[in-house]
Amino acid sequence: MKTYKKLFMFCMACLSLSVASAQTFTSYTTTESESWKAGKQPMKGKGNSTPLVVVSGNEEGVIFRAWGTTFNELDWDAFNQLTRDEQDEIMYNLFSPDGDLHFTHGRVSMNANDYARSWYSCSEVSGDFELRYFNIERDKRNIIPLARAAQKYYPQLQLFMSPWSPPAWMKINQDYPVLSNRLNKQDPRKDYVLYMDEGQSADPDEMKLLGDRSGVFPRRLALQDYFIKDPRYLQCYADMFCKFIDLYAEQGLPITKVMYQNEAYSYTPYPGCAWTAAGTLLFNNEYLAPTLAKKHPKVELWIGTFNTNRLDYVEKILDDPTLQKNVKGVGTQWECRNNLPQLRKRYPNLRFMQSESECGNGSMDWKAGEHTFFLLSDNLGNGCDEYYNWNFI
């Protein structure tokens, strides 16, 4: 209510100034060469064009609920290169209700993602099915402090979590990446297990930016799950999700949503895990959903994050009637935004989230800004009610 009152008073003040200054108002424009240029514009008493949008009051649409950003180890390293005043300015502008962006949510990964300093998991003891040695000590040093810096300006911060890779000991290749390359230590002889043929390297589109890819992505689908589908492993992994939620709650950071896997269709040389449709349904329906319902009934299970434009493959998962009962919504990013119009129409009872804004190559130029504006317009216009930035520093 206070925010609306301030907005009303500000608008009235602007109106008074306009009237007092011969019916003019101050406009601000930003171009590629100049930012926030102020100028005086005359007030027109009568419009000279037809309305672009006519609202009758009977329209139905999606209510936008929240947006936020991601907390990563390398973000924390960059954050610590700043002065305390610079840190406070950034977090105020991102998270304060009186700041610029008004972020209210954040994203974290269980175990290492591709913006970790090095690869790790919360469970490094092979065969620890009782999770005696499961811990978030690495998060306490490098991720939780960054989230707390955000909480300083928005104490009600909520998180959603998805892993990039299970612990290496839970995967058939016993390593964090899916495929080998010159930047990791995986034995290249293991690469054949993805497609079950010799000599197959990574998808040539895998490490390209979205605009440089063409056709369907991925070009080929994994023929087997990289997660070991033994019941002990599957149940232990579901228990890890709940343990992670517990430990973050002890740090004053509530996780309110989880997804089983980040980008299951990127067969990466960094932490990742390939899943088939059958494996996805098995883990979510028979292990993760019931375990969450028992231990954390208020935490929402979403399915994702989908990063493929293979609509038929996504529908193969979402058409499952048991899954539809178990999940609250769908996380989409990168290629999957091409499927949003069809998915919204086919699954009207599910919510949709844009779970990772395309960060590009960090050029921070006008073209990148236009692309981000397009992403916001495209995802929100096609029904996403939450939107998550990737790195914010």
Task: Report residues per predicted region.
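Bacterial Sec-dependent N-terminal signal peptides
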Residues: 1-24
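N-terminal catalytic cores of secreted or lumenal carbohydrate-active enzymes
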Residues: 32-255
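Extracellular/periplasmic catalytic domains that process cell-envelope and extracellular macromolecules
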Residues: 59-64, 99-101, 152-154, 295-296, ...
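Beta-sheet entry/capping signal
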Residues: 66-68, 103-107, 156-160, 256-257, ...
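Active-site-proximal beta-strand/loop segments in catalytic clefts of secreted hydrolases
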Residues: 70-74, 108-112, 162-166, 260-264, ...
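Short secondary-structure boundary/capping segments
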Residues: 121-126, 174-180, 274-276, 317-318, ...
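Active-site neighborhood of glycoside hydrolase catalytic domains
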Residues: 233-363, 370-371
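Aromatic/acidic polysaccharide-binding cleft in carbohydrate-active enzymes
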Residues: 354-393
